[in-house]
Amino acid sequence: MVETQMDKLGFLLNHIGKQVTTKVLSNAHITQTMKEIILENHGVDGGAAKNVSKGKSSPKEKKHWTEFESWEQLSKSKRSFKEYWAERNEIVNTLLLNWDNVRGAIKKFLDDDREWCGRINMINGVPEIVEIIPSPYRAGENIYFGSEAMMPADIYSRVANKPAMFVFHTHPNLGSCCGGMPSICDISTTLRYLLMGWTAGHLIISSNQVGMLTVDKRIIVDLWANENPRWLMAQKILDIFMMLTSRRSLVNPWTLRDLKKILQDYGIEYIIFPSNDFFIYEDERLLMFSKKWTNFFTLHELLDDLETIETKASSTT
């Protein structure tokens, strides 16, 4: 029987679905403490908010939330996680942040031939980089989906699994690279952490802007009030991944304005923080939103890369 493009597409979507679901279920460490704090004061019907424990924190719990080695450890400390959750929501509600220090510190890395990722915390009310590590791959090495550079998932996860207010990765200056536009893989990976309530946002830092993906706490509350939040989380991320891929196949070229509008329908915000001098020229800011990007891979491009995906899939089974 001759294998058609639709047969290949079916295999591809099934493989992607398994990958997304497996990653969400294996990384979503939901504890009762987290659920109580997130649903507290929201009066969610059928949720844990009706049974919130009013017990006092242990006197031994004196760690600041940034001192924990992992989100899983932090989630077991009621006092510390509650402290983090309050700070996180305050930042997401205002987003009045000055990124000059971060942009200054990251500038030299944007001319490198690879991506970098790391963590950012608020220090004296200002975002500051507290960790930064490089991708082991130079531009053009070990990549597919038509991208120019990549950050391996295991390295990004190692960074993102540590408590921080923000996690970031860079889009280096590679000529045709799309600056601050997040790829579909960037979005699906980021949502695994944001929907858990981990971090206020994930950043894509390029030479001309800081872009941040974030979600309102109401989205997280609604998800966590579900009887099986991990499965709902996996379904939401997979829906967004498939929707963006199919829309990108029909709408070419793609703009930041297109992306922002679609993500907002899912309760996700992509916020642009240009540099101060970029803010002065309103026409340039509008141009950034209407500039036509091409880094989002289409279904056709996915099929072109199917041989690579099949090889990777078979090597892990």
From Swiss-Prot:
Keywords from the named record: Late protein, Virion
Highest rank taxon of the organism: Viruses
Gene Ontology cellular component terms for the protein in this record: virion component
Induction data: Expressed in the late phase of the viral replicative cycle.
Subcellular location: Virion
Assigned protein family: Belongs to the asfivirus F317L family.
Name of the molecule in the record: Uncharacterized protein F317L
Organism field: African swine fever virus (strain Badajoz 1971 Vero-adapted)
Higher taxonomy: Viruses, Varidnaviria, Bamfordvirae, Nucleocytoviricota, Pokkesviricetes
